Amino acid sequence: MEAHNQFLKTFQKERHDMKEAEKDEILLMENSRRFVMFPIKYHEIWAAYKKVEASFWTAEEIELAKDTEDFQKLTDDQKTYIGNLLALSISSDNLVNKYLIENFSAQLQNPEGKSFYGFQIMMENIYSEVYSMMVDAFFKDPKNIPLFKEIANLPEVKHKAAFIERWISNDDSLYAERLVAFAAKEGIFQAGNYASMFWLTDKKIMPGLAMANRNICRDRGAYTDFSCLLFAHLRTKPNPKIIEKIITEAVEIEKEYYSNSLPVEKFGMDLKSIHTYIEFVADGLLQGFGNEKYYNAVNPFEFMEDVATAGKTTFFEKKVSDYQKASDMSKSATPSKEINFDDDF
C-alpha cells in the first residue's frame, strides 16, 4: 500500500481537485428522482441496460449430460485444470460480490444505471449456480477439488483482493478510478480462463461448458464496457498515467495467476500466449478509457477473434439482436441505435 500511496502523491493536487469536483458530476449529483424510471434521461445508459436485459439466460439452459461424457475422456492434467479453474472462478465471483456492485449502484444517481447494476447482481447468482452445477456434474463434490481448501491462502488470490482494496474499496479512490479498476477486474481478471475454455471447446467437445463460457464471457464484456460508458459521461477524468497504472497492475496480477495457480502448460496451452492475450485485452480496455495502447499486443488465439473484447468491438456497437435469445429474435422490428463513446454527453 505504501508504493500505491507514493505513486498517487505525484497526482495529489489534481486528484484533490477532482475529488472536490465529484459533487458536481452529473452522474453523482443528488437526484430526488433517482428511483423514478420515466421519462428516460440517459438514453445511452438505458440502452446499455436494455441490451443486457435482452441477453438474459438461466442455468437451466446449460445442459451438461454430453459434457460429463466428454470430461471422462480428458487427461488427468486437463481434469485437474478444469477443477482448479472452476474453484478459482467461484472465488473470483466472490471478489465481484454484490457488495461492490451495490456500492456502485448506491453512488450512481440515475435509475437507468441502477437498473443495469440491479440486473448484474441478479446475473451473478446465475453464474455461481452454473459453476456449482459443473462442479457437481464433473467432480460430484467440491471436496474432490483440493484447491478449494487452499484458495484463501493463494498469493495470487490475495493480490487480486488487495487490488480491489487499493483501487475500489479505498475511500480515497476517485469515482473515475474505481470505474477503471472495476472494469479491469471484470475484463482482465479471468480473461485467460475464458480463453482456455474456448480453446478446449473449440475442439467440438463439452457443448454445455462452451455455451456457459460464451454467455458469461459476453456478459462480463458488457459489464466492462458499461464502466467505459459511465466514464465517458464524466466531465473530469484522471490522468492517463493513473488509468495506465490501474490496468497494468491488473495485467501483472493476472499473469502471475496463470504462472503459478493455473499452470496452463499441463492443460495443453502455451503460457506465453496466455500472457499475450491478457495484454491484448488490456490494450483494448485502455483504448476504451481513452488511453493509448501500452503493450501493442496481437491476439494470439484465432478462436477468440469473434469474442467481444472491451475497446475492440464494444458492447454498445452491437445490435440488441446479437444478445437476444433465438426465440425472441424474430420479434425485433426496430434496429437499435448505435452509441459512440465520442458523442458529447
UniProtKB/Swiss-Prot annotation:
Induction / repression: Induced by DNA-damage.
UniProt xrefs under PANTHER family: RIBONUCLEOSIDE-DIPHOSPHATE REDUCTASE SMALL CHAIN, RIBONUCLEOSIDE-DIPHOSPHATE REDUCTASE SUBUNIT M2
Pfam family, one: Ribonuc_red_sm
Similarity comment text for this entry: Belongs to the ribonucleoside diphosphate reductase small chain family.
UniProt entry tagged with the keyword DNA-binding: no
InterPro entries: Ferritin-like_SF, RNR-like, RNR_small, RNR_small_AS, RNR_small_fam
Swiss-Prot/TrEMBL catalytic activity: a 2'-deoxyribonucleoside 5'-diphosphate + [thioredoxin]-disulfide + H2O = a ribonucleoside 5'-diphosphate + [thioredoxin]-dithiol
Subunit comment: Heterotetramer of two large (R1) and two small (R2) subunits. S.cerevisiae has two different R1 subunits (RNR1 and RNR3) and two different R2 subunits (RNR2 and RNR4). The functional form of the small subunits is a RNR2-RNR4 heterodimer, where RNR2 provides the iron-radical center and RNR4 is required for proper folding of RNR2 and assembly with the large subunits. Under normal growth conditions, the active form of the large subunits is a homodimer of the constitutively expressed RNR1.
Residue positions, PTM N-acetylmethionine: M1
Gene Ontology molecular function: any one: ribonucleoside-diphosphate reductase activity, thioredoxin disulfide as acceptor
Protein name: Ribonucleoside-diphosphate reductase small chain 2
Catalytic residue list: Y131
Lineage top rank: taxon: Eukaryota
UniProt function note: Provides the precursors necessary for DNA synthesis. Catalyzes the biosynthesis of deoxyribonucleotides from the corresponding ribonucleotides. RNR4 is required for proper folding of RNR2 and assembly with the large subunits.
Entry keywords, A to Z: Acetylation, Deoxyribonucleotide synthesis, Isopeptide bond, Nucleus, Oxidoreductase, Phosphoprotein, Ubl conjugation
Residues with the Phosphoserine modification: S169, S332, S336
Coiled coil: none
GO biological process: deoxyribonucleotide biosynthetic process
Annotated thermal dependence: Optimum temperature is 30 degrees Celsius.
Residues joined by cross-link Glycyl lysine isopeptide (Lys-Gly) (interchain with G-Cter in ubiquitin): K337
